[in-house]
Amino acid sequence: MKRQKPFLNGLVIILLFSIVIVSIVIYLQRSPADDQAGREDDVPSEQHEQNEGKEEPNTKEPPELPMWYLDGPFELPIAGAAGYASVKQTLYEEPKADAAILSELAPGTPFEIREESGDYWLVETNSMSGWIEHRFAFINLPDVVPSILYNHTNSYDSRFKTSYLDIPELTGKALNPMIDFNERLEEEEYIMPILYQTAKKVFHAQQLALQNGDSLVIYETFRPRELQLLVNESMEKLAEENEEVAEGITGEPWSITWFINMNVSNHQRGLSLDLSLAEVNELTDQTIGDFKVLKVKDHTEYTMHTPIHELSAESAVFDRPIASADREGWKELEVNPEMTEPALKLQDYMVEAGFNPLASEWWHFNDVDALEDLKKEAGTGEFFIRETVNSTPQWEDITPTQ
């Protein structure tokens, strides 16, 4: 054992010498930034207090772009999307009901949505910005669910007919042009305003459709009160002159109000929509701002038992009327035997997403939850919508609620 001692002593000396050499190398390789960081640790406490009030620079690492938007209620973030006031809305300085009031937005006022905080949106109009309660606000569907097919025929060629006859002053007319160059999508697109809470259900229905090789085809969401009255008056006048038309909309058990509502309808409130269904022949993707979204490149619209907006009992879903707000009663009714399989599929998608069907029109669905939420506070649609105020979606604008 004594013979091994010189060897062990030598090994210890070599190890100590190596540690010293490594320490010297590390010291010499220290950067000025390291020295500065060390000195910052010695900053007096009062200077630390001054620094605490300073904002840290944005160190958010940029993701690989374009990216899929997977964390929100839509295909694209709401930041930058177009929105509209459906009623007179208070503009607050902060996102809370007791905040200072900046102004009021008139019904129909267009704005850009910038941020969401709880029950409020930060919005920007052409002249001001502030927070509004989004419960009463519309959002433009193409801005957040661009994969849906949109065809607002009332913008260029109204499909309204009754008993397959043209309705004077309506059929084939541009009754309500709702199309604009959409800065966000960088193309002309129809304007499809709908309540924010209802829009989330529409997105759900589109997801269900896409999973089964289909896509929604939306023809109309918001309809101005003035147009509603025009359709009603034209229908009544034609029915007075034509017995066939009268029988088609008033024969038992139906009445004209089942095809055109004489009162404020759910279209004016922003919680219903008219739509059809298409088979997707080719599905691809497209880039919008910093995001990738699905795009239906080719489709074939299904044939239903009547054309859309054929306002007569021929278009009925069930054998008799039932209140549109009845959540369960319609499930007990006899289905119109003329209903096609695609019409039944459309109903399945919409019902699973939270909508109620309308007994008299296969294309019309209501959001009863929104109706019960807003009650008499809902809008009456006494305005027109002609423009979009929006911007390209950017990843930096995403917040956890968007």
Residues of each region from the PLM?
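N-terminal Sec-pathway targeting helices
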Residues: K2-L16
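Sec-dependent signal peptide cleavage junction
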Residues: V22-E40
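Boundary regions of SH3-family modules and the immediately adjacent low-complexity/disordered segments
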Residues: G38-L76, E124-F160, G172, E183-R184, ...
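SH3/SH3-like beta-barrel superfamily modules
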Residues: W68, L102-R135
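Short, basic/aromatic beta-hairpin or loop at an interaction surface
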Residues: A81-T90
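Envelope-exposed proteins and targeting segments
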Residues: V87, D119, M128, L271-L273
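Short alpha-helix capping/helix-loop boundary micro-motifs
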Residues: E94-A100
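Cell-envelope/glycan interface and biosynthesis
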Residues: N140-T401
